[in-house]
Design a protein with these regions (language model features):
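Ser/Thr/Pro- and often Gln-rich low-complexity regulatory segments
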Residues: 2-558
Length: 558
C-alpha cells in the first residue's frame, strides 16, 4: 500500500472511530474529560502504623461520638487472633473475639463479644449516636444488633435484639438515616425490598416493600449488591446499582426519575465494586443548592466471572462519573483516574475534597479475585478544573484488598484497616489476611500549616444545635485571613465493602466573623436547614481556614 493510501486509511479509521463515539454518547449527552498528564506523587501526607495487630480483620467500622471506633468482622470462619476475656460466654465454643472497640485518643483496643454472624452486614448511627447494626449471614441475616457508647471504655458491649427482627434477610444491604430519624434498610442478596427501623404499626412500616429497580439491575454476576444510597435535600433518595440510578420517593414507593446510565462498560456495585459519595452540600444565602453525586471505580462487564472461575484478572475501571442530580437535564461528567481501581474507599475530607484509597488495579471483589493492590491514595480536588482534579499521594506499604476499610477521624486523619481476600484467616502467600490498623495523615496536618490552622475554643450552642439556629463558634489561630474561614458538619459513616453509608458533609451558611481578641475569632453560622439536608444525629464540626481544618468536635443536630 502506498504512503498516500496508508495516510488516507488512517484518517478514515480515525474519523469513523470519532463519529462512532459521538453516536454512542449522543443519547445521553455525557461528557468525557480528557485527562491532563499524570500528576507527580506529592510529598505531603504520610502514613503511620497504629497497631500491628488488633486480632481481627476490619471488615466493618463505625466511629462513635465519643471518639471510639467499633470494628468487626464475621463469626463463621473459625477463631480469630484475639481471645475473649476469661469467664466470657463463648458462643459455639469459639472463645475468640470477632469485634473490638478501638480508642482513637489512646490508641488502645479491647475485645467485644459477637454472638450471631455479621458477615457482609450494614448499619447506621441513630439520632442518639447508638449503632443500629442490621443483618449478616446465616443465623444473623434477620438480626438487629445495637451498640450504645458509654463513658467507661470497659462497660460497653453488643446487644442483640431477639424480640425485634428484620422482615427480610439482609446480606449485602445498604442503610441510610432518614429525616425523621428512622433508618431505611434496602436490598441484599436475592432480596428486592426495603424496610425501616424502628418498626411502627401506626406508620405501617412493619413490613417490607418491593422495589422493582433492584430486580432490573441484577445481572448474571449480580453487580447490584450494597447499592449506593444518598439522601437528597428534597427528601428523596438517590439510588445507584450496577450502572443505573433513580430518584426515589421512599414514602410513596414511587420512582420519580430515571437518570441516564453511567457511560461505559464498567459495573460499579458488588462484586464489581466501586464507590460513591454525595459531594459537599454548601448552604449559602445566594444561589440554588448544588447537589452532586460522584461514583468512582468498579470493573468491566464479565470481570467477576473471569476472576472467580478462571482467575483471569482484567483491568479495573479507570473512570469516575459525576452527576448534578438536581439539574433539569442531568448528564454524567466522566473523568479518568490516574490509576485503575476496584474496591476503592472514598472518604470526604473537611476541606470538601475526596480521598480515594485502598483496592486493586485488576480483578473484582470476592475470595482471591483481585491482584495488583493500589498502594497510592489519590486526592480528588472537587473544585479544580475537570482535567486537574486528581493528585497521586504517598503510598502505604500494606495492601488493602477485599474486606478493607477507610474512614475520617476527628483530628482529620484517615483510619485504614482490614483486607482479607480469603475464606478464613491466612497469613501466608501473596496477600495475607491483614490485622493491622494504620492512619493516613493528609497534607493539611503538616506542622508548617500550624500558623493558619484554626483551633475550636468553644461552641456557643453547647453540644447540640437546632435546625436553622444561629450560633457562634469561637476559634483561635495566629494568622487570620479575611473571608477564608467556614464551618462544616461531617457525619460519621458506617463503612464496609468500599462504601461509607450515611457519609455526608454540610458546609454551614455563614452570617459573619467577629474578632474577639488578637488571636481569637467567632464564626457566626446557621444550623442545617432541615433533616433532609442533615438527618438528626451526631456530626463532627470543623472550622476550615485557608484550606486547613481544625480538629473536629462533636455536635448533635436536632
Amino acid at each position: 500500500m502506498s504512503s498516500k493510501k496508508q495516510s488516507f486509511f488512517v484518517i478514515f479509521v480515525s474519523l469513523f472511530f470519532l463519529f462512532s463515539l459521538l453516536e454512542i454518547n449522543k443519547a445521553n449527552r455525557s461528557v468525557f474529560v480528557t485527562p491532563s498528564p499524570p500528576s507527580s506523587i506529592v510529598s505531603g501526607g504520610y502514613w503511620e502504623l497504629l497497631q500491628s495487630s488488633i486480632g481481627i480483620s476490619a471488615m466493618h467500622v463505625q466511629l462513635l461520638p465519643n471518639n471510639k471506633v467499633i470494628i468487626f468482622d464475621r463469626t463463621d470462619f473459625g477463631p480469630s487472633n484475639l481471645s475473649l476475656p476469661y469467664g466470657t460466654y463463648c458462643p459455639g465454643n469459639d472463645c475468640t473475639a470477632h469485634s473490638v472497640l478501638y480508642d482513637v485518643d489512646s490508641n488502645t483496643f479491647r475485645p467485644l463479644r459477637l454472638v450471631t454472624d455479621t458477615f457482609c452486614s450494614s448499619g447506621s448511627l441513630d439520632h442518639d449516636g447508638i449503632l443500629i447494626q442490621t443483618g449478616g449471614f446465616s443465623q444473623g441475616d434477620h438480626l438487629i444488633r445495637t451498640f450504645t457508647p458509654c463513658d467507661s471504655f470497659d462497660d460497653c458491649d453488643w446487644n442483640e435484639l431477639n424480640q425485634s427482627r428484620l422482615v427480610d434477610r439482609r446480606w449485602y444491604a445498604t442503610n441510610h438515616v432518614l429525616p425523621d430519624g428512622r433508618i431505611i434498610i434496602l436490598g441484599g442478596r436475592r432480596v428486592f425490598t426495603y424496610e425501616f427501623y424502628p418498626k411502627d404499626d401506626f406508620l405501617n412500616n412493619n413490613k417490607s416493600i418491593y422495589l422493582q429497580f433492584l430486580v432490573e439491575t441484577r445481572d448474571p454476576d449480580e453487580n447490584n449488591l450494597y447499592p449506593f444510597l444518598h439522601l437528597l435535600p428534597d427528601g428523596n433518595l438517590f439510588i445507584f446499582a450496577n450502572k443505573n440510578s433513580i430518584l426515589f420517593d421512599y414514602k410513596r414507593s414511587i420512582v420519580l426519575k430515571q437518570f441516564p446510565l453511567i457511560p461505559g462498560d464498567d459495573k460499579r456495585n458488588y462484586p464489581s465494586t466501586g464507590s460513591s459519595i454525595l459531594l459537599p452540600l454548601r448552604l449559602s444565602s445566594t444561589g440554588p443548592l448544588v447537589v452532586e453525586v460522584l461514583v468512582c471505580g468498579g470493573a468491566p462487564s464479565g470481570a467477576f466471572l473471569k476472576a472467580d472461575t478462571m482467575k483471569i484478572y482484567v483491568e479495573a475501571s479507570r473512570t469516575c462519573g459525576r452527576l448534578r442530580v438536581n439539574d433539569q437535564d442531568p448528564q454524567w461528567l466522566m473523568e479518568f483516574m490516574p490509576i485503575p481501581r476496584v474496591m476503592p474507599d472514598m472518604v470526604l475530607l473537611p476541606t470538601g475534597d475526596v480521598i480515594i484509597i485502598n483496592g486493586a488495579a485488576n480483578g473484582t471483589a470476592g475470595w482471591e479475585d483481585a491482584v495488583n493492590p493500589v498502594l497510592n491514595p489519590v486526592l480528588y480536588s472537587v473544585n479544580e478544573e475537570p482535567d486537574r482534579r486528581f493528585t497521586v499521594l504517598s503510598p502505604s506499604k500494606i495492601p488493602r484488598l477485599y474486606h478493607s476499610v477507610a474512614m475520617l477521624l476527628p483530628e482529620g486523619r484517615i483510619l485504614v484497616g482490614g483486607s482479607n481476600p480469603h475464606t478464613s484467616y491466612v497469613f501466608t502467600g501473596l496477600y495475607p489476611t491483614e490485622l493491622s490498623l494504620e492512619a493516613y495523615n493528609p497534607y493539611y496536618l503538616d506542622p508548617k500549616f500550624n500558623s493558619i490552622r484554626p483551633s475550636i475554643v468553644s461552641v456557643e450552642s453547647g453540644s447540640s444545635v437546632l435546625y436553622g439556629q444561629r450560633f457562634g463558634i469561637a476559634f483561635s489561630l495566629s494568622l487570620y485571613k479575611q473571608g477564608a474561614a467556614f464551618a462544616a458538619l461531617m457525619s460519621p459513616p458506617f463503612t464496609t465493602h468500599s462504601f461509607g453509608m450515611n457519609q455526608r458533609m454540610v458546609v454551614l451558611k455563614t452570617a459573619s466573623v467577629v474578632q474577639l481578641t488578637m488571636f481569637e475569632y467567632k464564626l457566626l453560622v446557621y444550623g442545617p436547614t432541615n433533616g433532609n439536608v442533615a438527618p438528626p444525629g451526631y456530626y463532627m464540626l470543623f472550622v476550615v481556614h485557608s484550606g486547613i481544618p481544625s480538629h473536629g468536635v462533636w455536635l448533635k443536630v436536632t
